[in-house]
Structure formats: C-alpha cells, structure tokens
C-alpha cells in the first residue's frame, strides 16, 4: 500500500501539511479577539485561506463564518453566498432554520447539495437584485454575532468590484459592518491592486476601515526545513540545494511549491535522494495534467501576445522595453508591447509584482520553454 502523500495543494491545508506562520497567526488571532477588522493581501496561492483556518483552530469557542466570493456576478450571488455560509456554519440544522427565518423578506429557499449534503440557501433573485438587500444578509450576521462568538471571512473580496452596483454595495456593507464593533471581519483577496483600491482609496467607503496584514511568500529559512521534513515523511531525502531549485522554479509561491513537491513525490520511490535529475520528470507529470489547458490558453492569443509571453518566459519580466527584449518578442513598437502586456494581464496569464511581470502559473513558463518556442 502506497504511503499517504505528504504534500497538499489546491485546497485548505491544515494540520501537519500546513507550514506554520507563527507571527502572522499570532497577529491574526489577536485581531479577531479584539474585533479588529483586517485586510489580508497576498498573491494567489500564498496560503491566505489556510492561514485563516490555522487562526481559527487556535481560537476556542469561536465560530467562523466563511464566505467565498469567487466569481460572484450579481448582488443576488453575494446574498446567496452569505446566507449559505450562515446556514452551513454549524453541524446542527438550527443555523439553517434561523437563516431562513431572519431573511424571510428575501423569500429564501433551502435545498441540500447532493454532493456535500450541506444546506444551500437561495434568495429570490428579483428581491435580491436591489443592493439594499445586502443589509438584510448583514443583519443576519449581526443576529448570529449576538448569540455566538464569531468572526466573518470574506474571501476573494475583490470580486465585489465586478458588480454593476459596486459603489452602492460597498457603501451598504460598510454602513452595516461599522456598527458590529465587537465582530472581526477578515477581508482576503488575491488581486492586490483591487484590494488596495478598496481599502486605501479615499473615495472608497472602506477607506481606512481595516488594518492590512500582508501575506508574503514563506521565508526560506522556515519553508525549506518544513519541506525537507515532509519529504522525509514520504521516505525521500531532500537537501537545501534541491529545495532552493524548487523555490526558483516556482517563484516561492506556497501552493506551487507544494504542487511541484507533490509531483516529485509521485515520480520517485522510497529511499530516493533527490537531485536536479528529479526535476524534469516532475515537470512532465505537471505538463501531463495541465498541458491541454496551456495549449488552450495560448491558442487564444494573437501573434504579438504569444511572442510577448514567450519572451517573458525566456528573459523574465523586468526589462520589457529594452532593445534585447523587444527584439526577442518581435515587437514593432513600445505601444504594441504595452497592448500585448495589458491583454496578458487581463487574461490572468501574468501579473505585475513590484516592477516585474510574473506568470500566474510558473509551470506555464516552463512549459513554453520546454516547447522551444
């Protein structure tokens, strides 16, 4: 029987598979206890959600109302997410019944998800399209907060920017939340510019409404020993040089590091001493899983956009307008280069990190290089 894989990614990571962040965990726990609203800002797959769950595990007698806002498109979507999160907050169905009762004006219906067996609440879409309906669902949170010690997490909060009534939605949310002074709201987001705009723009209703807690890459001195120990748990021997090579390949993004280490584990046997020779087989496994997606993503690009992407893979993203880069990318002008970059960012293929453009998925970069484009 094959041993359980010691690396986890693409999900909330808890227990032994979670690499501790003691300072951040301690800060977040103290903010939650104090009812201090917090903004968690970090790039994709840095472990923000896992950090929140680790903080929750350290809090006795606190409930967490976790609301995932990814891909919301309407006010009705937002209301449904909050109501469903409230209904699922406890093991007992009393939360679902109370959620239905407290939101009676929105004509909610209760169903059971056939896969998870968890309750799902849907409000009347016509009633919920009025941004003022958000006040009803926040009032639901307020009622629960009076009865339970809880904190609220809005994950992927930048998705609110997608709503047609964005400004009104933010204003109503802020207007209700500011009176829940004993309840901590954690706003987590992976699109840094959008989160910064919501919480630092003087014109935003959420201006200076929460403390910012940055979630950077794990320090090498913490993450490397953790990974070496996890490999040892899987009967593989990794040294610091190998781990450093993994860091360089993945831009030190927590989730991508775990994914690559998982692929290494899959392509090696017990007792293996890991070296550079194990990198290519692990990449081939990832390409087998994600190659069709990479092909689809690049097939939609124009010639200029594709050439720009390949040049970024070859030369990196710091000297975009240098003569060498422009020649490699075959860009006719700086305007054409800027236009191609804008499209690649909009498509979620790259993002700006400081003054450097990086691949959202570092394995797309290595895939492009492996193809010899």
Task: Describe each region flagged by the PLM.
Residues 1-38, 43, 351:
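A short, basic N-terminal segment
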Residues 2-5, 288, 292-373:
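C-terminal leucine-rich, beta-strand-based interaction scaffolds used for sensing/assembly
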Residues 36-37, 41-46, 50-150, 160, ...:
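P-loop NTPase nucleotide-binding core
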Residues 76-83, 220-228, 322:
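An amphipathic alpha-helix signature
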Residues 124-192, 200:
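Conserved Walker B catalytic segment
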Residues 197-248, 269-272:
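Helix-loop-helix "sensor" segment of P-loop NTPases
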Residues 243-249, 255-269, 307-310, 342:
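C-terminal helical "lid" of AAA+/P-loop NTPase domains
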Residues 266-289:
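Conserved C-terminal helix/linker of AAA+ ATPases
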